């Protein structure tokens, strides 16, 4: 495993975690499933060995591709091709459901993948939105085969089955140990309604609640399942509700806006009797796929998507070429953030520029948001990065950054709340929720000047008056400081010295005059380095006022004064 560089955590569950990694030699991005220590937990070992065994014999364009298997320090590591987008992500972005054409393309590939497994006598047993990956080109891939297994031989029973309740067939809920491929067909019926409507079809909170949801829509269980229910000790003391035909709410009544072909397909998959549910090949021949020549047309389109994914996965070994191709694919959404150094020396013509690139995890979140904007086109145009999304510090803790290539200052990722940006947007079928424009925000902050008065003053009030007074006062101080700094030294004027102190000059007037001179001189002390004479003049004047009018200055005092030039 030393040849892989860990780029971050994708997700974790009860039996291990999935990490995004890069092959150091080829540069290929992969997903590595890291199981818990299998030697200490027999269940973990059983699930790991089952998934390894099945995926080694299953190779299909609609199944996730297992690349490598290794064991290190009692842990199993499974290396898969990396696909970070799921149908669950689409449902979160579009809570009112996906576009009809998108559901057609997704479901066609889902049934293809499940049919391939069934043809090898393998049932998945855990079909749900989060276990269905979608590549950048729109190719669907089933994943998480930890609960999958081969069909039981005659007389053999299944055990240890645990999967998501909302997609469980009735035979699983009542504890039937002789189920088959029909459990995956049931999950397909639940999935098609959820993809179109955005909400789960049967969101039960417990097994008995799940059965109640099913029976109120589809009617009573078959006699065999009713018998198994009452024999199951889990349901001891509980009775099944008896639903009359008039009380049932069928799919066409619950979802009157859905097309007839959708209702027909869903009802076939959700038949209460598992023996009457169709096979995958029968579903692909349904009107839902055959109308308007969709199946034939999309089969050709799908081959192009698969070839595109194959080209994207075969990355060059040279890191420079790989980086160039990645930057070209990102386009405008990954522009370099330019920060100008406003404290640079004004003598330099060009201001300093610092280039800071977003973190790897940010780019991935941006990629998901962009892929959502192209969901109606089924990602035909690839992915342009952005949006949003929030990044945890834990995701970034394992990221190895090459500082020699990126010497710029690292900016921590920001967490944005999309619901606060566009709270009223209805992300229905094919609509896209609002995405915040970060450049607009940066532009607003950059040109926001707190000292510029608005064109129309706010209504008069005590708070507005205080704010305006403070702003105007600060503006005046800024202008005054600027004038003082720009005041030339050659224009500094010294107070005039009176060598002839007239005898009729009164003492009080002399003191007042010299006080004004001191104040004026103190203002000029910070701007001029020329020594001040005001203090000497004050001393002489005070002596003159005490000695009486007409007392001339002594020769020694005049000798201490610097020679001044008088302008007439």
Swiss-Prot record:
It comes from the Eukaryota. It is found in: Cytoplasm; Nucleus. PROSITE patterns: PROTEIN_KINASE_ATP, PROTEIN_KINASE_DOM, PROTEIN_KINASE_ST. A motif ([NKR]KIAxRE) lies at residues 45-51. One of its GO terms (molecular function) is cyclin-dependent protein serine/threonine kinase activity. Its EC number is 2.7.11.22. Belongs to the protein kinase superfamily. CMGC Ser/Thr protein kinase family. CDC2/CDKX subfamily. This is Cyclin-dependent kinase-like 2.
């Amino acid at each position: 495993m030393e040849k892989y560089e860990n780029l971050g955590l994708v997700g974790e569950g009860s039996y291990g975690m999935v990490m995004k990694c890069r092959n150091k030699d080829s540069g290929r991005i992969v997903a590595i499933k890291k199981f818990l220590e299998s030697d200490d937990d027999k269940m973990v070992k059983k699930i790991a060995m089952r998934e390894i065994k099945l995926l080694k014999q299953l190779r299909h364009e609609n199944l996730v591709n297992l690349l490598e298997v290794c064991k290190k320090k009692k842990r199993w590591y499974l290396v898969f091709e990396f696909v970070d987008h799921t149908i669950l992500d689409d449902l979160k972005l579009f809570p009112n459901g996906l576009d009809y054409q998108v559901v057609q393309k997704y479901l066609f590939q889902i049934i293809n993948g499940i049919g391939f497994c069934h043809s090898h006598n393998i049932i998945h047993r855990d079909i749900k939105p989060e276990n269905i990956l979608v590549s950048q080109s729109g190719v669907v891939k089933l994943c998480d085969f930890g609960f999958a297994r081969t069909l039981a031989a005659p007389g053999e029973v299944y055990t240890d089955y645990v999967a998501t309740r909302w997609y469980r067939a009735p035979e699983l809920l009542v504890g039937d140990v002789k189920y088959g491929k029909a459990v995956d067909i049931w999950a397909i019926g639940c999935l098609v309604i959820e993809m179109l409507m955005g909400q789960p079809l049967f969101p039960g909170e417990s097994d008995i609640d799940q059965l109640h949801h099913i029976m109120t829509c589809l009617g009573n269980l078959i006699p065999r399942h009713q018998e198994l229910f009452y024999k199951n000790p889990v349901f001891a003391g509980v009775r099944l509700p008896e639903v009359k035909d008039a009380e049932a709410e069928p799919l066409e009544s619950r979802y009157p806006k859905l097309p007839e072909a959708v209702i027909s397909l869903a009802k076939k998959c959700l038949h209460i009797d598992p023996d009457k549910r169709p096979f995958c090949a029968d579903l692909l021949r349904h009107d839902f796929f055959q109308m308007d020549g969709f199946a034939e047309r999309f089969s050709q389109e799908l081959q192009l998507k698969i070839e595109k994914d194959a080209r994207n996965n075969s990355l060059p070994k040279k890191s420079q070429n790989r980086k160039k191709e990645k930057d070209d694919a990102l386009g405008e959404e990954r522009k370099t953030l330019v920060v100008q150094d406003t404290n640079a020396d004004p003598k330099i013509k060009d201001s300093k520029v610092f280039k800071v690139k977003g973190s790897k995890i940010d780019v991935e979140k941006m990629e998901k948001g962009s892929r959502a904007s192209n969901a109606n086109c089924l990602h035909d145009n690839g992915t342009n990065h952005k949006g949003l999304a929030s990044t945890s510090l834990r995701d970034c803790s394992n990221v190895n950054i090459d500082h020699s290539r990126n010497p710029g200052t690292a900016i921590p990722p920001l967490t944005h709340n999309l619901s606060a940006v566009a709270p009223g947007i209805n992300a229905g079928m094919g609509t896209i929720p609002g995405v915040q424009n970060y450049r607009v925000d940066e532009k607003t902050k950059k040109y926001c000047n707190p000292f510029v008065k608005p064109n129309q003053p706010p209504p008069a009030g005590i708070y507005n008056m205080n704010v305006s007074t403070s702003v105007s006062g600060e503006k005046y101080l800024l202008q005054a400081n600027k004038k003082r700094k720009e005041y030339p030294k050659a224009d500094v004027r010294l107070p005039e010295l009176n060598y002839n102190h007239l005898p009729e000059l009164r003492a009080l007037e002399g003191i007042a005059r010299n006080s004004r001179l001191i104040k004026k001189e103190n203002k000029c002390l910070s701007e001029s380095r020329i020594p001040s004479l005001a203090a000497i003049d004050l001393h002489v004047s005070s002596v003159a006022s005490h000695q009486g009018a007409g007392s001339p200055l002594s020769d020694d005092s005049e000798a201490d004064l610097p020679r001044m030039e008088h302008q007439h």
